[in-house]
UniProtKB/Swiss-Prot annotation:
Negatively regulates leptin receptor (LEPR) cell surface expression, and thus decreases response to leptin. Negatively regulates growth hormone (GH) receptor cell surface expression in liver. May play a role in liver resistance to GH during periods of reduced nutrient availability. It comes from the Eukaryota. Interacts with LEPR. Interacts with RAB13. One of its GO terms (cellular component) is Golgi membrane. Belongs to the OB-RGRP/VPS55 family. Keywords: Endosome, Golgi apparatus, Membrane, Transmembrane, Transmembrane helix. Induction: Up-regulated in the liver of fasting animals. The chain crosses the membrane at residues 7-27, 32-52, 69-89, 100-120. This is Leptin receptor gene-related protein. It comes from Mus musculus (Mouse). InterPro entries: Vps55/LEPROT (IPR007262). It is found in: Golgi apparatus membrane; Endosome membrane.
């Protein structure tokens, strides 16, 4: 039952993050949909971790070059997701209020993604058996 509660909490927080993102795009004062490009970063952020989890067989090692490279790429993706709205606001493509809403949505969504991996990524194999 704890897995179901965690899944409901994660889906609720994901919905809140996407609501912030949509508010940053669809409110009448802002009305520009360029910030939706951060959805691409949401999709590709876990991919380096998936690849490193599949390729790395030695789970007892304290450090793995593949795992460290995956952390590096994931960090670059997350920083890019936070940087894109700031750059768009700086060049006056979007307004600063929309930038703030998108940044709040980014924080909530990335914490949700991290929470998902902390809750459901504990298994030895890669099957997400707690679902």
């Amino acid at each position: 039952m704890a897995g179901v509660k965690a899944l409901v909490a994660l889906s609720f927080s994901g919905a809140i993050g996407l609501t912030f993102l949509m508010l940053g795009c669809a409110l009448e004062d802002y009305g520009v949909y360029w910030p939706l490009f951060v959805l691409i970063f949401y999709v590709i952020s876990p991919i380096p971790y998936f690849i490193a989890k599949r390729v790395t067989y030695d789970s007892d090692a304290t450090s793995s070059a593949c795992r460290e490279l995956a952390y590096f790429f994931t960090t670059g993706i997350v920083v890019s997701a936070f940087g894109l709205p700031v750059v768009l606001a700086r060049v006056d493509v979007i307004k600063w209020g929309a930038c703030g809403l998108v940044l709040a949505g980014n924080a909530v969504i990335f914490l949700t993604i991290q929470g998902f991996f902390l809750v459901f990524g504990r298994g030895d194999d890669f099957s997400w058996e707690q679902w």
